[in-house]
Amino acid sequence: MKEPIRVLQVLGTTGLGGAESRVMDLYRNIDRERVQFDFAVHTSKKGYFDEEIEALGGHIYRLPRFQVYNWIPYRAAWRSFLKEHSEYACVHGHMTSTASIYLPEAKRAKIALTAAHARSAGTEGGVKGMMTKWMRKNLWKKTDVCL
């Protein structure tokens, strides 16, 4: 039997948040013999959906959490991860604040399709908010699809 297409879902956690719940709704209802989801999360903590993801055949990979001061190591972690995991047909990013880093790395790794999925209505104030706005700027130029 043909191996399923693998899609990497990029999230902050596998907790009970809105994006995580919507992705899990999709995951439960797709034909997993044809498409499989794996998850890249930015926490070392176990998430609410971890056991279910693994039971459905998905893998969970833990990458470092982005901080302004770790831009280069964060990008290097993604570059290394994607070099080791060339099985993905798509990287679907739900974290638009850092998508301008990891989606270009996915393109660099020859991932066929990259998608940025923004659900956020805004940004915080202060330095973090300014950084988020700057990183989101021109995101549509760095990915195949912006939703």
Regions found by a protein language model. Give the residues of each.
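Membrane-interface segments of envelope glycosyltransferases acting on lipid-linked substrates or membrane lipids
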Residues: 1-147
